[in-house]
Amino acid sequence: MGPLTIRDVTVEFSLEEWHCLDTAQQNLYRDVMLENYRNLVFLGIAVSKPDLITCLEQGKEPCNMKRHEMVAKPPVMCSHIAEDLCPERDIKYFFQKVILRRYDKCEHENLQLRKGCKSVDECKVCKGGYNGLNQCLITTQSKMYQCDKYVKVFYKFSNSDRHKIRHTEKKTCKCKECGKSFCMLSQLTRHKRIHIRENSHKCEECGKAFNQSSALTRHKMTHTGEKPYKCEECGKAFNRSSHLTQHKVIHTREKPYKCEECGKAFNRSSHITQHKRIHNREKPFKYDECCKAFKWSSALTTLTQHKRIHTGEKPYKCEECGKAFNQSSALTRHKMIHTGEKPFQCEECGKAFNRSSHLTQHKIIHTKEKPYKCEECGKAFNRSSHLTKHKRIHTREKAYKCDEYCKAFNWSSALTTLTQHKIIHTGEKPYKCEECGKAFNRSSYLIRHKIIHTGEKPYKCEECGKAFNQSSHLTQHKIIHTGEKPYKCEECGKAFNRSSHLSQHKIIHTGEKPYKCEECGKPFNRFSYLTVHKRIHAGENPNKYEECGKACNHSSNLTKHNS
């Protein structure tokens, strides 16, 4: 037998045969023929490209189509072979009729190998007629094999051997660029597109290119908004079948992925992969700059984002105000400030939020659920942050400490409070009023101060119409109408409508005089009394009688004089 040629692995159809095939069968023929040709090119056997291959590459009908019918009926099958026929009868018939039509001349009746036989030599049942079959194979220069693992038909040695590689997992095709190996040449060809960035499938809508047609098809759904995969349970739709499959687990509550280490179960394979790293403490994504490591598979993105902390890079810029961010999600959230968009709405009360996390926290108000419980005392909370704060009561932990060693703060929010506290020592007042130049050490103080210039009093009493420039003043005022006195003295039972009034009253019982004059040492139980007393030393008499011009250092003395 001569050397292998393209003719040996070519199967030709008549025009009638070709039009009898459906689209799937025609595509199967194209794929097989093109792959055979690529294999010959890879082995250095094929020199020139036949017209048939050119037509197939261009998606046209095969150019070398025979104009006459070669054979009308398939070979006759042995009785013992018929018992082992696979359910894919149509595909087998297709190959028997078209690919094996030349065997009709053969004296040996059985040209189909018994299921489980890998070659002609192993088929013991048909061994009696082997000489006739062998003669036929030499004449037609073609062989047919059936793999015992999958129902597939192969012609020539190259196809059969190539198929066996898939089962043995032998990877003979290696990428010179990155060293990755593949079983099939076609797989290597597809892989090479990653390196050469061959993006032959381009989106007409946005110009984005892909190296696979299936990827382009999925991408197009982004523009059309098409979601063909719908959940029968709740009606939710998805643009990928895999996403629907993952979603269905929510309804079945199935958790098929179980950790062998601790027995914990998960509904996604990716979740168990992440979980396993807890046991082996694996953190594969590490940053060389600060040695910080990340353990989740998604941390490759997190690592990229983390690097921006060191580089200071902020590639995502707001077109509205110019503010830049180091994460695209942060920019998306920021844009809602300009648009006023609040897409996350509570179904219970209609309140809307610009973040899904805020809506989740809000919903707990309606359910009154308190899922975060203190193991120490049993107290429950509706937020994890509240539980974290509460735990510090038991540990007496004060994580945020002033460097001056004067005060410590135990709340997580105290990081801001600590920053504000430090200003007391530095005397810094970074918040300045543009109207009068007065400076403050807190932004909230400046906001309250500005109301003096504007005269604005946004907090109005619904009872009497009186307005205030601070909400706290309105709250205190409302007590006048209700007559409520919530602050009660434990010593004598006297009640007050302000906590500050109760604090002043308590000094009567203790006899304490905490406010001392630095000039003469005289103590007072109220700060206001000390302020008035200091005027004696300063010689200041701010309270003047208009009739006679006499001045007093205390308003009460002026009142007495007037009477």
Swiss-Prot record:
Protein keywords: DNA-binding, Metal-binding, Nucleus, Repeat, Transcription, Transcription regulation, Zinc, Zinc-finger
Domain KRAB, chain residue ranges per copy: 4-75
GO MF entry, a single one: RNA polymerase II cis-regulatory region sequence-specific DNA binding
CDD domains assigned: KRAB_A-box (cd07765)
Zinc finger intervals, C2H2-type: 173-195, 201-223, 229-251, 257-279, 285-310, 316-338, 344-366, 372-394, 400-425, 431-453, 459-481, 487-509, 515-537
Disulfide pairings: none
Pfam families (UniProt xref): KRAB (PF01352), zf-C2H2 (PF00096)
GO cellular component: nucleus
GO BP annotations, alphabetical order: regulation of DNA-templated transcription
Places the protein is found: Nucleus
Keyword Transcription regulation: yes
The protein's role, per its UniProt record: May be involved in transcriptional regulation.
Homology family: Belongs to the krueppel C2H2-type zinc-finger protein family.
Name of this protein: Zinc finger protein 257
